UniProtKB/Swiss-Prot annotation:
It comes from Clostridium perfringens (strain 13 / Type A). NCBIfam families: rplS_bact. This protein is located at the 30S-50S ribosomal subunit interface and may play a role in the structure and function of the aminoacyl-tRNA binding site. The keyword Secreted does not apply. One of its GO terms (molecular function) is structural constituent of ribosome. The keyword Ribonucleoprotein applies. Keywords: Ribonucleoprotein, Ribosomal protein. This is Large ribosomal subunit protein bL19. Coiled coil: none annotated. GO terms for cellular component: cytosolic large ribosomal subunit. It comes from the Bacteria. Belongs to the bacterial ribosomal protein bL19 family. Gene3D superfamilies: 2.30.30.790.
């Protein structure tokens, strides 16, 4: 049974999206349907969490807009995600960056990864 589920999930996983890690600043292009028309909205922020794996994988992006912290969780394989752009790579030593919620201003920045 487990092999059957894995085989079905493998078919539905999207391969066209850019790979990113925790700490990266990304732009998520999301399709939004309003009435009978569809448009693309861009949500830019820092990836603070990646969860699960395979078809059920999700990630959370955090940004501060007008002094208010906004977090949005997206399923990676959702059809509403048009594309993901990596703005900059971050250098972090944690898998979950929940400590950024308590920080304000420059303290909430993630160091940039230099290669």
């Amino acid at each position: 049974m487990n092999e059957i589920i894995r085989a079905i999930e493998k078919e539905q996983i999207r391969e066209d999206l850019t790979q990113f890690n925790i700490g990266d600043t990304i732009k998520v292009h999301v399709r939004i349907k309003e009435g009978n028309r569809e448009r693309i909205q861009v949500f830019e922020g820092t990836v603070i969490k990646k969860q699960n794996g395979g078809l059920r994988e999700t990630f959370t992006v955090r940004r501060v807009a007008y002094g208010v912290g906004v977090e949005r969780t997206f399923p990676i394989n959702a059809p509403i995600i048009d594309k993901i752009d990596v703005v900059r790579r971050g250098k972090v030593r944690r898998a979950k960056l929940f400590y950024l919620r308590d920080r304000v201003g420059k303290a909430a920045k993630v160091k940039e990864l230099t290669r």
